Amino acid sequence: MKYLIVGLGNIGGEYNGTRHNVGFRMVNALAEDGGVQFVEARYGAIAHMRVKNAELILLKPNTYMNLSGNAVRYWMQQENIPREQVLVLVDDLALPFGTLRLKPKGSDAGHNGLKNIAEVMGSIDYARLRFGLGDEFSKGRQVDFVLGRFTPEEEEKLPELTKHAVEIIKSFCLAGIQRTMNRYN
């Protein structure tokens, strides 16, 4: 079976390492685990890998966060991947830092990337793996927080957290969403 694994983030060097780009960080960790490299393609950088009998198409949209839906739709159509086999990797302010939560569907929770994907797909019925950023910011400073860098203490924990995310992604593809949620949520 084929799966589309989409890491959300903003393109451009100024966004590398920011909290909002943790989706890119997770999909990069998956590519590294699979020993594959991304190549530039239409609407983003793409990598192909296998995990046992599952074929994974990894995508880092180059459309900016708020237009991610165009890239997702294009690659779903290009690779003939149904919505049930799409997993979007995304940051989440509502979860404490480092919390990983797999969801089968849901609202955009104020995330513009998820909002655009839902608009373009015409549905909120697609899986997402949310990476908790926490809410350690002053009122009105949300944008600065998500576009800011992780603290040194957080950065120290990221390798282990992204490794855990890779396990969840692989389980999603091999065992299905329900079993994976039961095991990891």
Curated annotation (Swiss-Prot):
Pfam families: Pept_tRNA_hydro (PF01195)
Compartment(s) of residence: Cytoplasm
Domain of life of the source: Bacteria
InterPro entries, per database record: Pept_tRNA_hydro, Pept_tRNA_hydro_CS, Pept_tRNA_hydro_sf
Main subcellular location of this protein, as a coarse class: cytoplasm
GO cellular component entries: cytoplasm
Positions annotated to bind tRNA: Y15, Y64, N66, N112
HAMAP family noted in UniProt: Pept_tRNA_hydro_bact (MF_00083)
Keyword annotations of the record: Cytoplasm, Hydrolase, RNA-binding, tRNA-binding
Role, per record: Hydrolyzes ribosome-free peptidyl-tRNAs (with 1 or more amino acids incorporated), which drop off the ribosome during protein synthesis, or as a result of ribosome stalling.
Annotated protein name in UniProt: Peptidyl-tRNA hydrolase
GO molecular function term, any single one: peptidyl-tRNA hydrolase activity
Active-site feature positions: H20 (proton acceptor)
Catalytic activity: an N-acyl-L-alpha-aminoacyl-tRNA + H2O = an N-acyl-L-amino acid + a tRNA + H(+)
Family the UniProt entry places it in: Belongs to the PTH family.
GO biological process: protein quality control for misfolded or incompletely synthesized proteins; rescue of stalled ribosome
Enzyme nomenclature, EC number: 3.1.1.29
Gene, per the UniProt record: pth
RNA-binding listed as a keyword: yes
Annotated site residue numbers, Discriminates between blocked and unblocked aminoacyl-tRNA: N10
Organism expressing this protein natively: Porphyromonas gingivalis (strain ATCC 33277 / DSM 20709 / CIP 103683 / JCM 12257 / NCTC 11834 / 2561)
SUPFAM superfamilies in alphabetical order: Peptidyl-tRNA hydrolase-like
UniProt site (Stabilizes the basic form of H active site to accept a proton): D91
Subunit structure, interactors included: Monomer.
